[in-house]
Amino acid sequence: MDLRQIQYFIALFEDGSVTRAAKRLNIVQPALSMQIAKLETELRQQLFERGPHGMTPTDAARQMYRLYTPIMRDIDRARDQLSRQDAIVTGRVSLGMVSSEAESVLPESLARFNALFPQVEVSVADGFSAQLIDAVEAGRLDAAVINKPRGRLALDVVPLLDEEMVLVTSAALGPDLPPAIDLATLTGIELVLPTRRNGLRGVLDAALLAADVVIKPKFEIDLLNTIVQFVEQSAVATILPRVVVQRKVDESVLRARTIASPPIVRHIILVSHPKRPIGPAARALIDIIGEEIRRVTTGTPAA
C-alpha cells in the first residue's frame, strides 16, 4: 500500500463514483479502478460494492477511511508547513477541554500534533465548562473547547461541531431495547447521569424540558469513566455523548442507541479571549482535536 493508493481510495470513498473520482484526481478511470482492485487484493478485503448507481463502501472501507484520512491530512499539513519559510513553529499552547472530549480524543490528538510541531510546548486542563470559561477570561488558558452554555458569553465563540447524545447500556448485562429510543416511554430502566453542575446534564435537562419529558436518575456521578465502567458491569443505563463510548461500542462492550425523541444534541464550541488572538500552533491543535472527534463518532474528519 502506498500514498497514491490511499489518495485514490479516499477520493472514491468521498465521491462514490469512479467517473467523479477520476476527474477529481485528473487520471483515467481504468487507472483508478486498477489501483483500487490492487488495494483490495493486498488487503484481502472488498472495499466497494459495484452497482448501477455507483460504488458503495463496505464496512472495511468505512473503517479504512476512518483510519487513513487523518494520516493523509497530517501529511498535507506537514507538507504545507515544510514548504513555508516559517515552517518551524515554536511557543506554548494552553488549552482547556471538557473531560468528555479530553478523555476520548486527546491522546491521539496530542500524538498527531507533536509529530507536526515538535518544538511547541502544550498544557491541557480539563474541567467543567464554567471553570474553563473563567480560566480563558482570566488569561490562564489560550482557548477552551466546551459545551455551549445557555447564556451569552463575553468571549469569542467558534462553533466546532454538533454531537448526538445516546442511550448507553452494557452489551452483556443491559436490557433488550429497540435501536431507537423514546425517552417518554422508557420505563423500568435505572439511569446513572452526570450531576447538575456538569454541562452534559444541562444539555440533557434542557432537551427534556423543551419536550416536557421527565426522567429521574437513580445515580448521579460526575466522573465519566466511573459512569462508563458502572454501566459495563450492570443493567444500569446512561445518556452520554457518542464520543465518550464509541470505542467500547466498537469493541462490543457497550451498546449505544439513538434517542429518537426527544433528540438530544450538544453543541461543542471553542472560546477564546477577544483581546488575545489564537496563534497558529493553538489553531492547529484545535483543528486536529475536531478531526479526531469526527473520526471517532462518525468516521468523517473535519473539513
Question: Would you name each region that the model predicts?
Answer:
Residues 10, 42-43, 63-86, 296:
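Alpha-helical linker/hinge and terminal dimerization helices associated
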Residues 10-28:
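Short helix-boundary/capping micro-motifs
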Residues 40-57:
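A short LG(V/I)-centered, amphipathic sequence patch enriched
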Residues 88-153, 221-223:
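Central regulatory/effector-binding core of bacterial HTH transcription factors
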Residues 96, 165, 181-200, 290-294:
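Short loop->beta-strand "edge-of-pocket" segments that line small-molecule binding or catalytic clefts
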Residues 105, 257-299:
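A late-sequence structural motif
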Residues 128-133, 137-141, 146-147, 197-257:
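Hydrophobic hinge/microswitch elements
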Residues 152-191:
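Flexible hinge/capping segments at coil-to-helix
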